[in-house]
């Protein structure tokens, strides 16, 4: 009932604003106030972006409706159609609808604004951690729960499922309808690629060219439906991570027709593309001109680079991030193209979010396979220049490259590189050992997001040559290595495109069974059992992944334990994860021959252990030299201590 009343209140405010109610004939008409609403008890100061033709001339602003809420300052923009208004929501402020009064001589414009009661539960809920498995989906390609919104009159690009780069119709309702599948797999967190408005004329399905930071794209649903999805996910023990983009927006964003400030976005004449040189942000010898091109050049022509050095822009970005957390109750952020941002303002953005929500986790995409270059961007890292990003978590691209290399099939016609090279095709399992040997570089291993693939990398099933045995080894590594595991949708069943090279539209494929009329339904046990052809291994691999990740939820040694690993021999690799309650042993036989576990070699840990349990079969395991492990197989044992 409380939510219904809140919804009714907000809708009435929007209706009032849209109709111009409270605004006298001939006066300026306010068309936009953001944030859409605010709350009592927030640490973050409130600064309103007010938009409307001629509103910049209304520099006398006050608040009607009660004590505790007042205007502190009014700032004019370069454009006469904007004002930025600092509003103090005092400790004694009460929830309700207040009236903003804008004056220009005798002309007066009024606008209703809602202050709600803060939900204190949001500050106490745990964000995503090493206890979780994050399931990554592309919402347009996951499931279509509401065909009526596949195309909408207020968006440019219409549904075109037959095109790999078109919109296919997946939406929030489709996610809600399949939360049981995600939970049953063992996933406890859901990361969706961006859901906010993207009105690009082509390729808008990916969502990385945001055209509205305060509204869900209508082809996915609505803000209210997103909040409902978060609530239903929480009911099933699933946390929700919102994918956001701070580096760039879209040429289709409403403000590109009339920017508040001339430097709201970086504009170069002639046009300048970013140089994509990731090392510049930490290079003590870098030329300032090169750094400027990296930070201020556009990612692509359709994605304007945001100027976070503009203090009004930075406040605007801080507030929409905090607004979405408080409004929806989401549990974490993933930040796209993290180190393309101006690094100091971006560190302030991260700190503002975590100051408002202590313990809130944010993971940044710092795409580089050199450990020292990604370690720089993690909060608390002792950097040479004293810089602290305040970014809690980073994505472990070096480890992803190592796993891919260790288990990959050579590309036809391409010569295999040297073995054991980190991130190279044709390497053996030693590539994983080598990647983990760099762990001394990282400030906090518990805040490393580990993964096999994602929406920007070739399908791992293609990389592995469509070999289910390699997929099982990879899933085992993902479940048992240090860090926070993330699984790309469909990798639990080895989705493949048939192309070992990256093809964005094809690798972000539709989940079979997510659309009415699909001939295959991999969401159900019956559908997986009946699948054939390219899906022939779906049931076998899904059951394997489910066993691992359901077990992982209670494996404390994987949540906060230490790692002890041994030098690989003959393409085999053994390591222990352990804490005060549990010991887990993983033996990877990546060779073409069956071997026995050389327990004596692992005596440093195994000599202390008695009878254990095979995690994958449930069978008892004794520590002796007669434990056979077939070729291309992972062996996992646990002991309670």
Model-based region annotation:
Residues 6-15:
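Bacterial N-terminal signal peptides
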Residues 19-22, 107-109, 116-133, 180-186, ...:
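Carbohydrate-interacting/catalytic domains
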Residues 21-57, 111-124:
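Beta-strand/beta-sandwich contexts
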Residues 42-106:
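Immunoglobulin-like IPT/TIG beta-sandwich domains and homologous Ig-like subdomains
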Residues 125-149:
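Compositionally biased low-complexity segments at domain edges in trafficked proteins
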Residues 137, 182, 192, 213, ...:
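Conserved, mostly hydrophobic/aromatic
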Residues 142-327, 346-356, 361, 366, ...:
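Substrate-binding/active-site clefts of carbohydrate-active enzymes
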Residues 230, 248, 320-322, 326, ...:
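Active-site-proximal helices and loops of the catalytic beta/alpha 8
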């Amino acid at each position: 009932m409380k939510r219904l009343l809140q919804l009714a209140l907000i809708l009435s405010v929007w209706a009032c604003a849209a109709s111009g109610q409270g605004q006298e004939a001939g006066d300026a008409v306010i068309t936009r106030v953001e944030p859409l609403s605010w709350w009592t008890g927030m640490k973050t100061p409130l600064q309103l972006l007010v938009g409307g033709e001629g509103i910049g001339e209304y520099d006398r602003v006050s608040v009607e409706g009660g004590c505790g809420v007042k205007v502190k300052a009014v700032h004019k923009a370069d454009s006469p159609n904007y004002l930025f208004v600092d509003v103090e929501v005092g400790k004694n402020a009460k929830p309700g609808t207040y009236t903003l009064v804008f004056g220009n001589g005798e002309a007066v414009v009024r606008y209703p604004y809602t202050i709600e009661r803060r939900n204190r539960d949001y500050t106490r809920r745990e964000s995503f951690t090493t206890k979780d498995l994050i399931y990554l989906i592309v919402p347009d390609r996951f499931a279509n729960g509401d065909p009526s919104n596949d195309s909408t009159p207020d968006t440019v690009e219409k549904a075109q499922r037959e095109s790999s780069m078109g919109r296919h119709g997946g939406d929030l309702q489709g996610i809600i309808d399949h939360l049981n599948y995600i939970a049953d797999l063992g996933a406890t967190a859901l990361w969706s690629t961006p859901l906010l408005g993207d009105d690009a004329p082509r390729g808008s399905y990916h969502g990385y060219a945001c055209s509205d930071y305060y509204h869900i794209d209508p082809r996915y649903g609505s803000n209210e439906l997103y909040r409902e999805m978060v609530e239903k996910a929480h009911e099933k023990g699933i946390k929700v991570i919102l994918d956001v983009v701070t580096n760039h927006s879209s040429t289709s964003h409403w403000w590109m027709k009339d920017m508040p400030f001339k430097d709201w976005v970086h504009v170069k004449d002639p046009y300048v593309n970013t140089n994509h040189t990731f090392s510049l942000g930490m290079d003590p010898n870098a030329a300032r001109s090169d750094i400027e091109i990296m930070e201020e050049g556009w990612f692509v022509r359709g994605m304007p680079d945001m100027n976070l050095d503009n203090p009004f822009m930075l406040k605007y970005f801080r507030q929409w991030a905090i607004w979405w957390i408080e409004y929806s109750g989401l549990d974490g952020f993933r930040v796209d193209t993290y180190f393309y941002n101006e690094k100091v303002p971006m560190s302030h953005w991260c700190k503002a979010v975590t100051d408002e929500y202590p313990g809130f986790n944010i993971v940044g995409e710092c795409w580089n396979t050199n450990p020292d270059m990604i370690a720089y961007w993690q909060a608390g890292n002792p950097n040479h220049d004293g810089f602290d990003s305040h970014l809690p978590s980073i994505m472990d691209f070096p480890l992803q490259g190592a796993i891919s290399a260790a288990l990959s099939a050579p590309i036809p016609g391409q010569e295999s590189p040297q073995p054991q090279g980190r991130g190279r095709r044709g390497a053996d399992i030693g590539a994983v050992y080598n990647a983990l040997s760099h762990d001394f570089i990282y400030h906090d291993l518990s805040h490393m997001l580990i993964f096999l693939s994602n929406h920007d990398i070739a399908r791992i099933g293609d990389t592995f040559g469509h070999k289910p045995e390699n997929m099982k080894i990879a899933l085992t590594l993902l479940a048992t290595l240090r860090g926070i595991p993330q699984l790309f949708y469909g990798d639990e069943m080895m989705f493949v495109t048939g192309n070992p090279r990256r093809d964005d539209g094809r690798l972000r494929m539709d989940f079979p069974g997510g659309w009415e009329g699909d001939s295959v339904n991999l969401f159900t046990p019956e559908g997986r059992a009946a699948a054939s052809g390219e899906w022939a291994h779906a049931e076998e691999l899904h059951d394997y992944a489910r066993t691992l990740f359901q077990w992982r939820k209670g494996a404390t040694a994987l949540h906060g334990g230490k790692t002890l690993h041994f030098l690989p021999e003959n393409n085999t690799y053994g390591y222990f994860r352990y804490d005060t309650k549990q010991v887990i042993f993983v033996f990877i036989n990546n060779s073409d021959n069956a071997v026995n576990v050389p327990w004596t070699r692992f005596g440093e840990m195994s000599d202390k252990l008695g009878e254990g349990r095979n995690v994958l079969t449930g069978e008892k395991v004794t520590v002796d030299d007669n434990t056979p492990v077939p070729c291309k197989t992972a062996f996992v044992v646990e002991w309670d201590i």
